Curated annotation (Swiss-Prot):
InterPro entries: ADH-like_C, ADH-like_N, ADH_Zn_CS, CAD-like, GroES-like_sf, NAD(P)-bd_dom_sf, PKS_ER. NAD(+) binds at residues 187-192. Its EC number is 1.1.99.41. Its cofactor is Zn(2+). It catalyses: (3R)-3-hydroxy-16-methoxy-2,3-dihydrotabersonine + A = (3R)-1,2-didehydro-3-hydroxy-16-methoxy-2,3-dihydrotabersonine + AH2; (3R)-3-hydroxy-2,3-dihydrotabersonine + A = (3R)-1,2-didehydro-3-hydroxy-2,3-dihydrotabersonine + AH2. The lineage of its organism: Eukaryota, Viridiplantae, Streptophyta, Embryophyta, Tracheophyta. It comes from Catharanthus roseus (Madagascar periwinkle). Zn(2+) 2 binds at residues 102, 105, 108, 116. SUPFAM superfamilies: GroES-like (SSF50129), NAD(P)-binding Rossmann-fold domains (SSF51735). Induction: Up-regulated by herbivory. Belongs to the zinc-containing alcohol dehydrogenase family. This is 16-methoxy-2,3-dihydro-3-hydroxytabersonine synthase.
Length: 356
């Protein structure tokens, strides 16, 4: 960015958490002016992630006030810098969690930008200034912006920028994206419901593993799973022993892993994507028997993110969402505390957010 552009800024407004009350309220602030490699977009939709709610409650110990949340950002380009090559005014675009990295370290080179030690997040999580996407405009380097497919809905597509890549990437990375592969999904929440949709789009045979017997009908009728296991039903679990090529575990709290290992075929893979905040207990013997593998995955590169929205547009994969107005955000956060949403809140910024 030139010194002249750096000296300028543009007025913006959003919703901010200004103190430890846990309540968001209107907030006027400044974003950087559009630099020569930047794209400015009018934000139309922004997904509400459980991460945003954890930041609201300072569960990571890293929340800085004022905190403007939002990293599932979809909108329309309104301005481009003089050296921008990938976008033009009027393009539909998306911005996810990472908006800059060093671009030189080994992590960046292998597509693990989310793990770059100099990563900059859209909402300021990584000890760097930043205001998230729950605002009227956003400015980002073009290299961290994706082109939004014309036939992909912007509201129900917004969560693909976070939870979508969270489940899509490990399916691809661990070879669970082939027709006929048997994939287990643990948990039918925000991540789990999209994991089912992507696995089915790949042609996999999907087993939902849940602690809630009451989710069986929904799993079959709404999401078209091929089988359903109640994790506490020892007889069902035993009957399904060594039937799965891989399992995506989406549950965000610590739970027993041994029953899941037993479901895996020899050389099967258990991939943790639920981000529990306490350590698991794992028996090495359970893995050694059959050469089973445990791994973890979170997020993906900008290239991965572009790939996922293109795939989703081609295969009609979107999240099940509840679209809400801006003034409903505090209520939505309270409902997230109770897991009371099917399956993702998305804020209609474009139609319901007016300058305070």
């Amino acid at each position: 960015m030139s010194s002249e552009m750096a000296a300028k800024s543009v007025k913006a407004f959003g919703l901010a958490l200004k103190d430890s009350s846990g309540l968001f309220s209107p907030f006027n602030f400044s974003r950087r002016a559009t630099g020569e490699h930047d794209v400015q977009l009018k934000v139309l939709y922004c997904g509400v992630c459980n991460f945003d709610n954890l930041m609201r409650r300072n569960k990571y110990g890293r929340t800085k006030f004022p905190y403007v949340f939002g990293h599932e950002i979809v909108g329309v380009v309104t301005e481009v810098g003089s050296n921008v090559k990938k976008f033009k005014i009027g393009n539909k675009v998306g911005v996810s969690f990472i908006v800059d990295t060093c671009r030189e370290c080994e992590r960046c080179k292998i597509g693990q930008q989310i793990a770059c030690k100099k990563a900059v997040s859209s909402d300021g999580f990584f000890e760097t200034p930043g205001y998230g996407g729950c605002s009227n405009i956003f400015v980002a380097d073009e290299n961290y912006v994706i082109l939004w497919p014309e036939n992909l809905p912007m509201d129900s597509g917004a969560p693909l920028l976070c939870i979508g890549i969270t489940c899509y990437n490990p399916l691809r990375r661990f070879g669970l994206d082939k027709p006929g592969v048997r994939v287990g999904i643990v948990g039918l929440g925000a991540v789990g419901h999209l994991a089912i949709k992507f696995a089915k789009a790949f042609g996999a045979r999907v087993t939902l593993i849940s602690s809630s017997p009451g989710k069986k009908d929904e799993a079959f009728q709404k999401f078209g799973v091929d089988s359903f296991l109640v994790s506490s039903n020892a007889e069902e679990m035993q009957a399904a022993a060594e039937t799965l090529d891989g399992i995506l575990d989406t549950v965000p709290v610590v739970h027993p892993l041994e029953p899941l290992f037993a479901l895996l075929k020899p050389l099967g893979k258990l991939i943790i994507i639920g981000e529990p905040h306490k350590p698991f207990e794992v028996s090495a013997m359970s893995l050694m028997e059959g050469g089973k593998i445990i791994s973890a995955s979170t997020g993906g590169s900008i290239k991965d993110t572009q790939e996922i929205v293109d795939f989703a547009a081609e295969h009609n994969v979107v999240a099940d969402v509840e679209v809400i107005p801006v003034d409903y955000v505090n209520t939505a956060m309270e409902r997230l505390d109770k897991a009371d949403v099917k399956y993702r809140f998305v804020i209609d910024i474009g139609n319901t957010f007016k300058s305070p």
